[in-house]
């Protein structure tokens, strides 16, 4: 995530002693449970500050669900706390949302009380100092404006809009019919306050417009809400199995990315995959289909720049067909696409002998792409799990 001043924010979990350049972070040597780190770097990669949070409860697994930066440089962090303490304040075990100042001081902590499980999967700044939270839950939760109930034995998707003080403006919940599910995996907000959500559903679901129905285990969807949370439009990639795990917005464009198998039609053109492949689909702000691309790679994260160009990151097994010259060895890729037709402007590939993962991408005001992810280590056969990965930050010129 990139702040307005070009600084780079990152949040992750760690299981080994860690030093990001400012000295060793706190580490509980008697626990193999995940720790959590949030850090801020300068545009040149110099550490400004970092917080390492140690687990106090082995029964709750720490998790990073989302990271966002508002226009003032405040940092919003969402996920699951394992009984963390930051400064003199506690983050009780369970789902949490916290706001940190640009200097890293903890300012606010918000919880969503209830029963069952809740996963925060994505955050997006709303342009007014607040944040929009997306995820899924089971059981019952109080989102601040109402108590929401997921059908017994099912997971339902939720979106909550909060102001800069962490108070709820509105919340929305979507549940599937019968034995289905709905999960929200990504969220973005445009300059007019419109909220865009992507994820997957099974069975049948009504987001506020015509009902969507699938016979697949999971089918990708995208939807738009007004600034007040009213349904504007909803779409799915009918005929496919997969998840829309990324979304980004530009001038009159909504870009949706993820992975799929099966076949879908976009503007009358078929996109077919017998195994898991990546896709990017572009809509205009009214939900009209503009273009789509599918390719032999994952589509992990999306970001747009001031020109509306789309930056896409993921991993591939050597069959990348986004426009890389020559045979591209398996590894990571970063691609920039034209917003009008999806044509590749440039593609960079980075080979790796292990299985790399690109987790997020952002573009700063200068057009630099910043990618965060993880690299798998090579272990001897029989090494027990969990097997730690090494995190990385990568900054590319425009």
Q: What does each of the following model-derived ranges do?
A:
Residues 1-398:
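A sequence-level/structural motif corresponding to short, flexible coil/turn segments enriched
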């Amino acid at each position: 995530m990139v702040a307005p001043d070009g600084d780079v924010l990152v949040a992750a979990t760690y299981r080994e002693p860690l030093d990001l350049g400012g000295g060793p972070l706190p580490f509980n040597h008697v626990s193999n449970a995940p720790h959590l780190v949030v850090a801020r770097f300068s545009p040149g990669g110099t550490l400004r500050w970092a917080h390492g949070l140690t687990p106090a409860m082995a029964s709750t697994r720490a998790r990073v669900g989302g990271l966002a930066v508002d226009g003032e440089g405040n940092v919003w962090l969402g996920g699951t706390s394992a009984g963390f303490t930051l400064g003199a304040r506690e983050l009780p075990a369970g789902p949490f949302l916290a706001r940190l100042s640009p200097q890293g001081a903890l300012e606010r902590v918000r919880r969503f009380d209830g029963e069952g499980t809740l996963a925060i999967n994505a955050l997006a700044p709303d342009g007014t100092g607040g944040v929009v939270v997306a995820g899924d839950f089971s059981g019952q939760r109080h989102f601040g404006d109402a108590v929401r109930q997921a059908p017994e034995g099912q997971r339902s998707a939720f979106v909550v809009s909060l102001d800069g003080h962490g108070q709820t403006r509105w919340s929305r919940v979507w549940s599937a019919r019968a034995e289905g599910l709905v999960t929200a995996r990504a969220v973005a907000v445009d300059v007019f306050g419109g909220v865009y959500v992507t994820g997957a559903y099974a069975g049948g679901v009504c987001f506020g417009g015509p009902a969507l129905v699938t016979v697949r285990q999971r089918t990708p969807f995208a939807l738009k809400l007004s600034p007040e949370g009213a349904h504007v439009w909803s779409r799915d990639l009918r005929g496919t199995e997969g998840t829309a795990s990324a979304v980004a917005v530009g001038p009159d464009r909504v870009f949706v990315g993820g992975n799929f198998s099966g076949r879908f039609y976009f503007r009358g053109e078929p996109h077919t995959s017998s195994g898991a492949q990546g896709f990017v689909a572009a809509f205009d702000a009214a939900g009209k289909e503009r273009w789509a691309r599918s390719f032999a790679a994952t589509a992990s994260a999306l970001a747009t720049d001031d020109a509306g160009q789309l930056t896409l990151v993921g991993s591939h097994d050597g069959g990348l067909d986004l426009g890389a010259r020559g045979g591209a060895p398996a590894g990571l890729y970063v691609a920039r696409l034209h917003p009008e037709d999806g044509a590749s402007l440039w593609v960079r590939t980075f080979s790796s002998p292990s299985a790399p993962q690109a987790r997020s991408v952002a573009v700063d005001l200068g057009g630099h792409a910043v990618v965060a992810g993880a690299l798998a280590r090579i272990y001897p056969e029989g090494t027990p799990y969990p097997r730690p990965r090494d995190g990385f930050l990568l900054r590319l010129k425009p």
